[in-house]
Amino acid sequence: RRLHGQAINRPGSCPRVMIYCPARHPPNKCTSDYDCPKPQKCCPGYCGKQCYQPE
């Protein structure tokens, strides 16, 4: 969802990622929070962006 050209993010913060996959451009499973079921957020993950429960 966008409001006046800006993406609206869901509350909370993304979990911290400690290790990343070796792929140069891993595929993303989401592009914004609104690609994820509520209340999840679209966050950088181990290998590309994924939906996670916010912290």
Curated annotation (Swiss-Prot):
This is Caltrin-like protein 2. It comes from Cavia porcellus (Guinea pig). It comes from the Eukaryota. Glycosylated. SUPFAM superfamilies: Elafin-like. InterPro entries: Elafin-like_sf, WAP_dom. Disulfide bonds: none annotated. GO terms for cellular component: extracellular region. GO terms for molecular function: peptidase inhibitor activity. Residues 7-55 form the WAP domain. Signal peptide: none annotated. The keyword Calcium applies. Inhibits calcium transport into spermatozoa. Keywords: Calcium, Glycoprotein.
